[in-house]
A protein has these predicted regions:
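Sequence-specific dsDNA recognition surfaces
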Residues: 14-19, 34-52, 66-96, 116
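Specificity-determining recognition surfaces
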Residues: 144-176
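Short, well-ordered beta-strand elements within core beta-sheets of diverse protein domains
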Residues: 20-23, 85, 127-131, 172-178
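Non-catalytic DNA-recognition/assembly elements of restriction-modification systems
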Residues: 14-45, 177-203
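Extended, domain-scale alpha-helical bundle/helix-rich regions
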Residues: 1-12
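A short beta-sheet element
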Residues: 64-65, 83-146, 163-165
Length: 203
């Protein structure tokens, strides 16, 4: 994707580690994920969202690890909790358009929450990212989190042996390469076009 001379250089937001993953174009900047987010929070402790809190009514959709696919949202394992219970775990509430990241199995994969349900909450093993869209496009950030650049940072710092996991505090510190917004838009369009071609070939 070509760079345009007319595009401004990205402003550096927050501190950047000297140990950056790779060299990037001059107008891009490395920015920690927490500095690209209005809010980052993880799901409730297991005792705060148990089967006894589930409901058969379509009230507040619970985002399960199985919904966070490696290639997008997977609409399976559908479970709901009540509006009343969701109000007791406000930091774990999620809106459509937010990004959610799995903390395990495998750690670091991310999806954009769809608008198929009116309201959502996280399971205990996921993290929500409310994107600062004035700095980075949601689709671009989602692609960046799912890239090898981000995954290498995650897997260099995972915990556990049988159930390898990451954490909210670690995810906040990992770095994202941020181009100017217009260039982000062109990159997203190019990636989506390539995915579309792959889907046509695989059909």
């Amino acid at each position: 994707v070509p760079q345009l001379d007319s595009e401004p250089e990205v402003e550096q937001i927050g501190e950047v580690s000297e140990d950056v993953p790779l060299e990037i174009p001059a107008k891009w900047k490395w920015v920690k994920l927490e500095n690209l987010s209005r809010e980052m929070a993880d799901g409730p402790f297991g005792s705060n969202l148990k089967k006894e809190h589930y409901t058969n009514k379509h009230e507040v959709r619970i985002i399960q690890l199985s919904n966070i696919g490696e290639h997008g949202w997977r609409d399976e394992n559908v479970k709901y909790t009540t509006h009343t219970h969701a109000e007791t775990i406000p930091r774990s509430r999620v809106n459509s358009g937010d990004i959610v990241i799995a903390k395990m199995m495998p750690a670091g994969r991310a999806v954009i929450v769809p608008d198929s349900d009116a309201s959502y909450v996280l399971c205990s093993d996921a993290v929500k990212v409310v994107v600062k869209t004035e700095l980075i496009l949601t689709k671009f950030l989602n692609f960046a989190i799912n890239s090898q650049i981000f995954k290498q940072q995650v897997y260099a710092n995972v915990q556990g042996t049988t159930r390898v996991r990451t954490s909210l505090s670690k995810l906040k510190t990992y770095q994202i390469p941020v181009p100017p917004l217009e260039e982000q838009s062109r990159i997203v369009a190019k990636i989506e076009a390539l995915f579309s071609q792959v889907e046509k070939i695989s059909v």
